[in-house]
């Protein structure tokens, strides 16, 4: 009966965090609008081989993540939940692997359930796992690879070992097809310390080639198909998206070596108090095969991405699955022997909640700031933000009431965040970061436009997805579409600032021309170097400028 209650509680937890509130949040640009539009175009065109964005070739990522996103929009429609359905599904599948792997390692159902809840409630997992990017997919394939390798090495018969390595190769292959060759580097680096400490080199060399074969066979059909359709895809994807992005001096998203330290700290909320003890206990028990394996899958990817020049918080998402297992194991030991870490965790959550309440007041219309984040007419959003932090502090306090029994309620600290964050975003943020908000405000003007031009790829993708059209023209800036715009058949999809006046004269009689520009909050739009317009509609950071036929 207790198991049934636990399952009901888990499903309610998942519904409140990962299902019910998702549609209340508008899509963020540039990431969510980009992936939403790529998948919409894939469904509309029926081309499941070559990814396109705004009708242009888009070679920044392989195809598998777009497949999953497209299935999400096909099943649930072109809406906020449909766009995020794929990442939510991948996150929940990863949580299922956490459950299964924890149960296999320790044979403890309670521990397995706790590891799952800890994983799903980690701030970084929740933030990325409900945000339409490709990282939850690659995290799933990496965690699946972690489980597959363990299965292979624990099998006694050659059939079990062979099956495990074949499965490992498939997961690596799908990882390559999701985000590239990092899906090969991370598993290799993660298993090497465990193989070395356990002296299992023989099994690795005997059966490892099976993983290589299954990986190649997984990637080969699509790899050959896109090479035939677009011969330069692999050159661009390997050199630009891997070497330049991560290793060269001009790498994208450059950051210092210690970049991930604050990411780990913030990402571990509301379980931050368990982080030091989980890592220390894992190291202290490194003679235990399972513990050192989880520790290796936590630390090695973190070191790898720290050494790389290009860094983003999403890159280390896969580290938090083994870390959640270590945290759950340590938490049960602490509850049984010395609950000091659990008390510290409760106080950290109280401090975080109280700090958030104070910070919300400071940036509110009633605070000391001359330019508050929220305006007076957005008072309800301020109260939503206060509710988020109040609930965080409340559940932090509740875990201290009987810490040996109530410590696990820290999983409810982000409940307010899950339910209310979509209602607390300031209008000034929505106007710049949520193209849907802009489209809703300017729908009547945008809909009849013959041509739409914009200077932001993220805004362009948002306009295309909302208006269900992929012919948005880039104005003045090419951004990440630079490579796709170099193709001969992309002529006419970019208009420079110097050419705009002539282009306008040539096309004005064909219908309404709409220019959507991103501007600074205090920028005078009358000073823009553009021909006089027939209509201007400013929505803070985005401006709609229209030219009608003469």
From Swiss-Prot:
The keyword Cell membrane applies. The keyword Transmembrane applies. It is found in: Cell inner membrane. One of its GO terms (molecular function) is 4-amino-4-deoxy-L-arabinose transferase activity. It catalyses: 4-amino-4-deoxy-alpha-L-arabinopyranosyl di-trans,octa-cis-undecaprenyl phosphate + lipid IVA = lipid IIA + di-trans,octa-cis-undecaprenyl phosphate. InterPro entries: ArnT_tfrase (IPR022839), Glyco_trans_39/83 (IPR003342), LipidA_mod_glycosyltrf_83 (IPR050297). HAMAP family: ArnT_transfer. This is Undecaprenyl phosphate-alpha-4-amino-4-deoxy-L-arabinose arabinosyl transferase. It comes from Escherichia coli (strain 55989 / EAEC). The gene is arnT.
């Amino acid at each position: 009966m207790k198991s049934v209650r636990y399952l009901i509680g888990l499903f309610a937890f998942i519904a409140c965090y990962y299902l019910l509130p998702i549609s209340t949040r508008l899509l963020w640009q540039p990431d969510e609008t980009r992936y939403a539009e790529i998948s919409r175009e894939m469904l509309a065109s029926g081309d499941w081989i070559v990814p396109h964005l705004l009708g242009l070739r888009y070679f920044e990522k392989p195809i598998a993540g777009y497949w999953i996103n497209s299935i999400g929009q096909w099943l649930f429609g072109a809406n906020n939940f449909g766009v995020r359905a794929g990442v939510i599904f991948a996150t929940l599948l990863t949580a299922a692997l956490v459950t299964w792997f924890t149960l296999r390692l320790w044979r403890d159902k309670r521990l397995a359930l706790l590891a799952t809840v800890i994983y799903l409630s980690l701030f970084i997992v929740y933030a990325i796992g409900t945000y339409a990017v490709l990282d939850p997919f690659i995290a799933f394939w990496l965690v699946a690879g972690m489980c597959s390798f363990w299965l292979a090495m624990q099998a006694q018969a050659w059939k079990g070992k062979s099956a495990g390595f074949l499965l490992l190769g498939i997961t690596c292959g799908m990882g390559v097809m999701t985000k590239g060759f990092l899906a090969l580097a991370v598993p290799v680096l993660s298993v090497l310390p465990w193989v070395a400490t356990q002296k299992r080199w023989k099994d690795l060399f005997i059966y490892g080639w099976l993983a290589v074969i299954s990986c190649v066979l997984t990637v080969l059909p699509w790899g050959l198909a896109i090479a035939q359709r677009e011969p330069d895809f692999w050159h661009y994807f390997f050199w630009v998206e891997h070497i330049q992005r991560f290793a060269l001096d001009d790498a994208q998203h450059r950051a210092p070596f210690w970049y991930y330290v604050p990411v780990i700290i913030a990402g571990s909320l509301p379980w931050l108090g368990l982080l030091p003890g989980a890592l220390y206990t894992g190291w202290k028990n490194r003679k235990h095969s399972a513990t050192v394996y989880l520790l290796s899958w936590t630390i090695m990817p973190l070191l790898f991405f720290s050494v790389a020049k290009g860094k983003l918080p999403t890159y280390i998402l896969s580290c938090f699955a083994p870390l959640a297992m270590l945290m759950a194991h340590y938490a049960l030991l602490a509850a049984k022997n010395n609950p000091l870490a659990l008390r510290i965790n409760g106080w950290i959550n109280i401090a975080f909640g109280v700090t958030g309440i104070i910070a919300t007041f400071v940036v509110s219309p009633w605070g000391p700031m001359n330019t508050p984040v929220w305006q007076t007419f957005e008072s309800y959003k301020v109260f939503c933000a206060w509710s988020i932090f109040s609930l965080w502090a409340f559940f932090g306090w509740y875990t201290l009431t009987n810490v040996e029994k109530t410590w696990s309620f820290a999983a409810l600290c982000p409940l307010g965040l899950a339910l209310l964050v979509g209602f607390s975003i300031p209008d000034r943020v929505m106007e710049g970061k949520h193209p849907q908000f802009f489209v809703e405000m300017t729908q009547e003007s945008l809909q009849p436009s013959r041509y739409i031009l914009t200077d932001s790829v993220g805004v362009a993708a948002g306009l295309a997805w909302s208006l269900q059209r992929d012919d948005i023209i880039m104005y003045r800036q090419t951004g990440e579409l630079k490579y796709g715009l170099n193709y001969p058949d992309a002529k006419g999809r970019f208009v420079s600032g110097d050419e705009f006046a002539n282009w306008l004269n040539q096309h004005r009689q064909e219908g309404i021309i709409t220019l959507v520009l991103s501007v600074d909050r205090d920028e005078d739009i009358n000073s823009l170097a553009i021909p006089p317009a027939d209509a201007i509609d400013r929505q803070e950071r985005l401006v709609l400028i229209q030219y009608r036929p003469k």
